[in-house]
Amino acid sequence: MVKMLFFAFLPLLFMTGIAAESTISSGLNSLKTKIDAKMPSGKQLFDKVVEMQKQIDAKFSNDDERAKVMGAIGSLSTAVGKFQSGDPAKIASGCLDILVGISSVLKDFAKFSPIFSILSLVVGLFSGTKAEESVGSVVKKAVQEQSDQELQEALYGVKREYAVSKAFLDGVRNETSDLSPTEVSALAANVPIYQGVRFIAMVVQRIKYIKPKTESEIKRMLTMLELFTDLCSLRDLILLDLYQLVATPGHSPNIASGIKEVSNLGREEYKKVFEDLLKNDDKETYLFLSYLYPREKNEQSRKIFNFFDLMKVKYDDRLKQDLTGVKIFSNVHWPNYFMCSSNDYLALICTKPYGSLKLDKLNDGYYSIKTTQHDPKICHRYGNYILFTHKRNDDLEKFNFVPVKLEKREIYLLSSKESPNKFAYVPQNADGALFFVDGIPSKVGYGNQGYFTLVE
């Protein structure tokens, strides 16, 4: 009954914000007059609306701003049908529609945050239904994405400030006359030695404690990493330029020494963050590594690894190796069985390595797996298993060997460019096709059946 009352008047609630002269308060007051508060179900809905009104009035003192928010909600008439459908997925989609609409007119996250509380009141009407969990997950996801967006925008701002500082220092360097003591002090006081540290620390925390599990989360993480490397690289260059200028004989050795220590401290911090991230004995990072490796995969990946080299970050040396020519694939669970082609599909039915397969590195850093015969067949993923054919299959025939560790053993996970989140594994009986499964095989019940060793 509560839901019926609510949805009967929900269009009215939305419409109140479409006209510029309307406010959220007047719209909610109009809604309240339609509710029979004497009935138990009506009283529950009335209390929800009163609470919603208090929160909105407290946050949005400007009528025009409130009208914009309500207009964003009111323009999303399709969300009403989704709420009325009773289907959890559609209800969740409706919530997301509303969030996206509001975010399009509210760029200030401090004012955007209460909208989630308001939406939670609406979600509260679904208490005790199967829709509750679905809607809650959407709200949580939206909060995370909005938070990431705000953080990225802040990082872009600091990056711009660093770029201006770098240009300023380049101009100072081009001047041939010596710096006066006053100018040295001005440089040390105004070039942002400390600026951006807070935002760098925020990203560090995000990198350290969030383990991305989905494609969208991983892509957000990679974007964050790219921003982080840009920011840290610029900051390092600024500190280096400033140090070289201030360290000139006759200037201030104390300030120069301090700048050098700040630079060294930053480099050590960056190294620690990335070395922890790239620990290839942590199963929680395997999926993320499958998107990051190989380093030649794309411009973003190359950029990140170039920064690793600049900061002397330690990572698996096998990333620098070319696996072209590898001919034997052995499975950790079945070390005496080797991959070979049979009846147009790849299977672990060979008890002796006949050298019938080989790897060829492609220009994007992935590998093709081919037979060594005169007219070679090309391996490609087909659904959840692998076929050998003469037909080209683009990204499906591009494979990624992700270097990981198992009890100090150097091994590989096998995925494809088309689906980095799917990994190959060998059947328990070591007979039949090589299969792919969503997620890390060892984490979804396949033990060591998803780990491989490669031999030239």
From Swiss-Prot:
Give the UniProt subcellular location, in the record's own words. Answer: Secreted; Nematocyst; Target cell membrane
Which GO terms label this protein's molecular function in UniProt?
toxin activity
**How this protein is processed and modified after translation, per its record?**
Contains disulfide bonds.
- Keyword Signal present in the record's keywords: the answer is yes
GO BP: any one term? monoatomic ion transport
Query: What cellular-component terms does GO give this entry?
Result: extracellular region; membrane; nematocyst; other organism cell membrane
Query: From which residue to which does the signal peptide run?
Result: 1-20
Is Ion transport set as a keyword in this record? yes
**Where is the major localization of this protein?**
secreted
| Superkingdom per UniProt | Eukaryota
Keyword list, A-Z: Cardiotoxin, Disulfide bond, Ion transport, Membrane, Nematocyst, Secreted, Signal, Target cell membrane, Target membrane, Toxin, Transmembrane, Transport
User: Which body tissues produce this protein?
Assistant: Nematocytes.
The text of the family note is: Belongs to the jellyfish toxin family. Type I subfamily.
Subunit relationships: Oligomer.
**Protein's job:** May cause profound effects on the cardiovascular system of anesthetized rats (at 25 ug/kg), since the fraction containing this toxin and CfTX-2 produces an initial increase in mean arterial pressure, followed by cardiovascular collapse in all animals within 1 minute of injection. To note, the same fraction does not induce significant change in heart rate. Has weak hemolytic activity. Is lethal to crayfish. Causes cutaneous inflammation in humans. May act as a pore-forming toxin, disrupting normal transmembrane ion concentration gradients in susceptible cells.
Could you share any additional remarks the record makes about this protein? Negative results: the fraction containing this toxin and CfTX-2 does not cross-react with CfTX-A and CfTX-B antibodies.
Q: What is this protein called?
A: Toxin CfTX-1
